[in-house]
């Protein structure tokens, strides 16, 4: 499942669920990135984790650490900043995950997508009531 969050960490959109063997980047290329590229082309950054390395221009991911030595100080600072900026998006995942209907879901993947979409609606309604 792919989630798009606003800069404050509130979930705005959730994708349909893909089989567990589908890599994050493959699902993102199919479901999310085509919608985000126009914004990235206008300079709006898209932040992602290391699973999205190679996603394309405008998608910022941390620099991977390789076994041949420590990361350069610049790369470590870059990783720290990207991770800190991504923290609100992780909050968005937590907001969706708080609904008990999503605990230990064992139904078909097609139904999981509908349950997650309902959780997004409930999260939006809950936000409006505060």
Model-derived regions, located:
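Short, well-ordered secondary-structure "scaffold" segments embedded in the functional core
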Residues: 1-130
């Amino acid at each position: 499942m792919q989630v798009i969050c606003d800069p404050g960490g509130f979930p705005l959109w959730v994708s349909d669920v893909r089989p567990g063997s589908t890599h994050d980047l493959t699902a993102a290329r199919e479901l999310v990135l085509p919608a985000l590229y126009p914004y990235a082309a206008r300079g709006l950054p898209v932040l992602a984790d290391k699973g999205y390395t190679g996603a394309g221009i405008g998608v910022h991911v941390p620099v991977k650490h390789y076994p041949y030595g420590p990361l350069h100080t610049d790369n470590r600072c870059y990783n720290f900043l990207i991770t800190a900026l991504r923290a609100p998006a992780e909050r968005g995942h937590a907001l969706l995950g708080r609904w008990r209907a999503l605990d230990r879901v064992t139904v078909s993947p097609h139904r999981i997508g509908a349950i997650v979409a309902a959780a997004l609606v409930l999260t939006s309604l809950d936000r409006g009531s505060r």
